[in-house]
């Protein structure tokens, strides 16, 4: 089987890094097309031996990208096309059908109740999504929570498959030596209690809540923010105004999978933390929380379907927090008062092993490879 994965961009992000990890475990010959931004993850995929094509799309309405994408699919002789993220799902499904491929699947990585990929959901976005969804044979939801959102949108339940995001458990196994070295490298005091936040620095992630929570905690508490994004300068200013700028560290974008770049990777940074806090109120999965649990960290979160969809005993060190900075400050103080626990991965982390996710996806591939009636692009346009 030859498969083509089409994704909107390949900068450092959850969906992008998940694609790279997945391709390491899929027993399928895969190429990747990125519509825009062939960033750090594109370099990582190339280092893994994956062929990456940059389509050079200039914007959402660059219709010249469609015939170029059709040509790439035809020339590649692909049996299956798998799309990721909104723009790639719109253009990728249509291009695959025009190129004669019928085995089409899309993964819905980031559908929230009120936003998708950090943007507000409107009637136009939903209508276009549903029209293009009909061109494929299946839509993969990364959690039962997202599957429920898709059903409420109007995607027929038989077309939805749940394939959770996966993690490389061995990659996140706690290493006390790496913890010590990373904390030294970051210049952290030996007695620092380190609160971690991981993710794109965007307004929707609400990392400002953690900055304000830090201001309510004793002076030996530090905040380590792992990720890059447009809100970094805003967060720096917020930290300065709150009087905690000297206790907030920004690492910038860090790879989840080793890519040879200098500086500590995500696992080492998780080892350096004492607790992970995730104040984002609307998540589709909560990959950062699961990775933190795999590193043996206690977690305080506002939203995490990956944990909420499992029995409570699966992640005893994970607690949901309702409220803003005051609530997080109390929850983090309670986490510290509980004292350190063995840094072992709970059942929830094992549930999300990447091998299991890859096996589930292969089952989806096998199902959609079986011919079944589905509408043509012309039929969808007419409807």
Model-flagged regions — what are they?
Residues 5-64, 149, 229-230:
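N-terminal strand-loop element at the rim of the active site
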Residues 13-21, 193, 197-216, 230-236, ...:
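A conserved mid-protein helix/loop that constitutes part of the nucleotide-sugar donor-binding site
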Residues 63-67, 102-105, 112-135, 148:
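Nucleotide-sugar donor phosphate/pyrophosphate-binding loop at the beta->alpha transition
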Residues 281:
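Aromatic "clamp/platform" in nucleotide-sugar-dependent glycosyltransferases that forms part
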Residues 73, 253-254, 259-264, 268-273:
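Short alpha-helical donor nucleotide-sugar binding micro-motif in glycosyltransferases
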């Amino acid at each position: 089987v030859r498969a083509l994965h089409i994704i909107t961009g390949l900068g450092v992000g959850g969906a992008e890094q998940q694609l790279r990890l997945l391709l390491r475990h899929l027993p399928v010959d895969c190429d990747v097309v990125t519509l825009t931004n062939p960033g750090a993850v594109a370099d990582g995929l190339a280092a893994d031996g994956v062929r990456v094509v940059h389509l050079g799309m200039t914007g959402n309405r660059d219709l010249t990208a469609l015939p170029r994408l059709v040509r790439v699919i035809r020339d590649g002789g692909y049996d299956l096309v798998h799309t990721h993220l909104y723009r790639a799902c719109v253009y990728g499904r249509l291009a695959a059908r025009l190129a004669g491929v019928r085995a089409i699947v899309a993964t819905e990585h980031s559908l929230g109740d009120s936003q998708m990929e950090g943007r507000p959901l409107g009637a136009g976005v939903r209508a276009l999504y549903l029209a293009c969804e009909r061109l494929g044979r299946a839509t993969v939801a990364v959690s039962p929570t997202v599957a429920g959102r898709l059903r409420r949108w109007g995607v027929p339940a038989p077309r939805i498959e749940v394939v959770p995001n996966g993690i490389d458990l061995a990659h996140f196994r706690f290493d006390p030596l790496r913890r010590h070295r990373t904390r030294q490298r970051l210049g952290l005091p030996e007695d620092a209690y380190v609160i971690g936040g991981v993710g794109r620095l965007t307004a929707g992630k609400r990392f400002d809540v953690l900055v304000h929570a830090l201001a309510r905690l004793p002076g030996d508490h530090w905040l380590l923010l792992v990720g890059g994004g447009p809100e970094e300068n805003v967060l720096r200013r917020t930290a300065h105004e709150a009087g905690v700028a000297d206790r907030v560290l920004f690492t910038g974008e860090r790879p989840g999978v080793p890519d040879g770049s200098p500086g500590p990777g995500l696992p080492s940074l998780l080892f350096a933390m004492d607790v992970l806090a995730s104040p984002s109120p609307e998540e589709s999965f909560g990959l950062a929380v699961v990775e933190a649990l795999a590193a043996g960290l206690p977690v305080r979160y506002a939203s995490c379907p990956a944990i909420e969809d499992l029995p409570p005993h699966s992640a005893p060190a994970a607690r949901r927090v309702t409220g803003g900075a005051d609530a997080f400050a109390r929850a983090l103080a309670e986490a510290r008062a509980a004292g350190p626990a063995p840094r072992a991965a709970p059942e929830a982390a094992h549930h999300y092993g990447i091998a299991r996710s890859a096996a589930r996806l292969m089952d989806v591939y096998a199902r959609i490879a079986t011919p079944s009636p589905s509408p043509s692009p012309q039929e969808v346009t007419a409807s």
